[in-house]
Amino acid sequence: MPRILAIDYGQKRTGIAITDEMQIIASGLTTIASETSIAFLRDYFTKEKVEKVLIGEPKQMNGEPSQSTDIIEKFVTKFKNNFPDMAIERVDERFTSKMAFQTMIDSGLKKKQRQNKALVDEISATIMLQDYLTRKI
């Protein structure tokens, strides 16, 4: 069964998570520089079967688009142009960064380790993907 990939796209960094082949468990894959995201994905898609890509949709508490929406929309357009046959689903990414930070605290990471923003982005993508899998059941 092909995998599902989640992208937490940001201005500087992009967190990426992937499911196992049974689409049961979400795991962090990596964090990359955002400007390299299309090249990274192109390479990844040649190595792994992916049936769908989830892309975080930043929203404010009231459901309105956040200030980073324009950046994400430009990425989505670029993604669609490069991978026209790939299924995309937009998912609400509110609170994922806070949940990622709390996960780091709960897992016992020291303060210096918790300041690793790349790790926060990867965990955020993983939380987004696991939430999607839970709702899919």
From Swiss-Prot:
Main location: cytoplasm
InterPro entries: RNaseH-like_sf, YqgF, YqgF/RNaseH-like_dom, YqgF/RNaseH-like_dom_sf
Gene3D superfamilies xref list: YqgF/RNase H-like domain
Keywords of this entry: Cytoplasm, Hydrolase, Nuclease, Ribosome biogenesis
Subcellular location: Cytoplasm
UniProt-listed GO biological process terms: rRNA 5'-end processing
CDD domains from the UniProt entry: YqgF
Record EC number: 3.1.-.-
Matching Pfam families: RuvX
Annotated GO CC locations: cytosol
Single GO molecular function: nuclease activity
Transmembrane annotation, as ranges: none
UniProt KW Nuclease keyword: yes
Function (record text): Could be a nuclease involved in processing of the 5'-end of pre-16S rRNA.
Family: Belongs to the YqgF nuclease family.
PANTHER family xref list: POLYNUCLEOTIDYL TRANSFERASE, RIBONUCLEASE H-LIKE SUPERFAMILY PROTEIN
Protein name: Putative pre-16S rRNA nuclease
Species whose genome carries this gene: Flavobacterium psychrophilum (strain ATCC 49511 / DSM 21280 / CIP 103535 / JIP02/86)
